[in-house]
Amino acid sequence: MPKPVQKPHPELMIGGGGEKVTLRIAAQHADHWNVWGGPETLTHKGRILDEHCAKVGRDPKQILRSAVMVLGFADDRAGVERIQQSYMKRMGADEAKARDTVLAGSVSQIRDKLAKLQAAGVGMLFIPTFLLPTDRHGALDRFMSEIAPAFRS
């Protein structure tokens, strides 16, 4: 037998960016909304989520927003493009989606993109390790030591 409704209840995360159905359901029920994408995606989809929230009388700030982005350090534009191409091939993404979703470049370029993500209302970032370079631990260590501290409150 299932237990009665628990208080506090486990939080519900809804992932996806479907503008008519998924975001409407997230506006009604989610504690947390997650989608693959960067600043462009989160700004656009976030506006639509806000509209759905208004329709159901919910404060959109009640929903934690998070993004999934692919991390890669690169010293030049060619390196960034290699990371984007790898993402496109592996995930079947087009070039525009890759430019938005891939968090790649120098430390300052990655920080700049994260600042835009934060400005879009994102409060949490997921970095899938299965898409990291061969040196997964090195990339994560570098991210945590050189980038993350600037975004921690």
Where in the sequence are the language-model features?
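Active-site-adjacent structural elements that line small-molecule/cofactor binding pockets in enzymes
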Residues: M1-S153
